[in-house]
Design a protein with these regions (language model features):
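Short, hydrophobic/aliphatic alpha-helical segments
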Residues: 4-8, 58-61, 186-188
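Short clusters of hydrophobic/aromatic residues that line enzyme substrate/ligand-binding pockets
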Residues: 9, 45, 197-198
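Conserved PLP-enzyme active-site core in the AAT-like
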Residues: 70-269, 274, 279-280
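N-terminal amphipathic/basic leader segments beginning at the initiator methionine
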Residues: 1-38
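Short, basic and Ser/Thr-rich N-terminal targeting/leader segments
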Residues: 21-22, 65, 113
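Conserved N-terminal alpha-helix of the aminotransferase class I/II PLP-enzyme fold
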Residues: 31-80, 85, 101-110
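A generic secondary-structure signal marking the coil-to-beta-strand transition
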Residues: 5, 22-26, 41, 68, ...
Length: 282
């Protein structure tokens, strides 16, 4: 068992300090009592903070080697929150091969509110650099794209972004922190549709944002609290439970897809296979 596997099973806040329970209980309360007037409390209203959700968020941050994590009601809610830190007139460079829901959010919502978008092939660093404008604030991309599995180097893009004082935002849904931890390669913000591999059982709709520093954490938390697209305590518990088997599931899924690709390569009816996990394939 590796250090990462141990993190999957033993979350930072797994034990409940109130009861001694070895797993975090599901706290359904919407409001929390003050011990006395004016006393500082960790939670007062569940939209702003919930013990079950917080335990999950701390686990997400640990898996991605981040400073703070935030759990949302869907992957799109997470993407919305990450992009909402920008303001009217800001310019973003985005990958030209991104999830369709992200494309729709960018071009039919955020552009309408004044965010400027330029799509480029993020595998081409020269194309990224040529797209940088005085008002450019960030580069957003998927390291392995949905659905054609085109591969972009997080390390190279992040290095270019740092040269120009830009944020690097990575949608790590397809790889998960088991296969890639973008923050360790220079990224600033990582996004997940936790509905997919993190949950793993097709029974939770969830999203996650993990950030590298406190300044970004404060900005994302403000958006999470203001917009209210939080993950429920029940779904937070289900997602935390699914995360425990992430490495086991992905190991089996990787082995299965290699067998499938080997089989498809022998079929004359199949003209092209997109799978970067086998040498020689795009």
């Amino acid at each position: 068992m590796t250090r990462f596997d141990t993190k999957l099973v033993h979350a930072p806040a797994q034990h409940d300090n109130n009861t001694g329970a070895v797993t975090t209980p599901i706290y359904k309360a919407t409001t929390f009592a003050y011990p006395e007037i004016g006393a500082p409390v960790k939670d007062d209203y569940s939209r702003s903070g919930n013990p079950t959700r917080r335990a999950l968020e701390e686990q997400l941050a640990a898996l991605e080697e981040g400073t703070a994590g935030f759990a949302f009601s869907s992957g799109m809610a997470a993407i919305h929150a990450a992009l909402a830190i920008f303001k009217q007139g800001d310019h973003l460079i985005v990958g030209n091969q991104i999830y369709g829901g992200t494309f729709r959010l960018l071009h039919q919502f955020f552009e309408r509110w004044g965010l400027k978008i330029t799509a480029v092939d993020t595998r081409n660093l020269a194309a990224i650099e040529a797209a940088i404008q005085p008002n450019t604030k960030a580069i957003y991309f998927e390291p392995v794209t949905n659905p054609l599995l085109q591969v972009t180097s997080v390390q190279k893009v992040a290095a270019l972004a740092q040269q120009h004082h830009l944020l690097t935002i990575v949608d790590n849904t397809f790889l998960s922190p088991y296969l890639l931890q973008p923050l360790t390669l220079g990224a600033d913000i990582v996004i997940h549709s936790a509905t997919k591999y993190l949950s793993g059982h097709s029974d939770v709709s969830a999203g996650a944002v993990i950030v590298k520093d406190r300044e970004l954490a404060e900005r994302v938390y403000f958006i999470q609290n203001a917009l209210g697209s939080i993950l429920s305590p029940e779904d937070s518990n289900e997602l935390a439970r699914g995360i425990k088997t992430l490495s086991l599931r992905l190991d089996r899924q990787i082995a299965n897809v290699k067998e499938l690709v080997n089989y498809l390569q022998g079929l004359g009816e199949v003209k092209k296979i997109y799978y970067p996990g086998i040498k020689g394939l795009p």
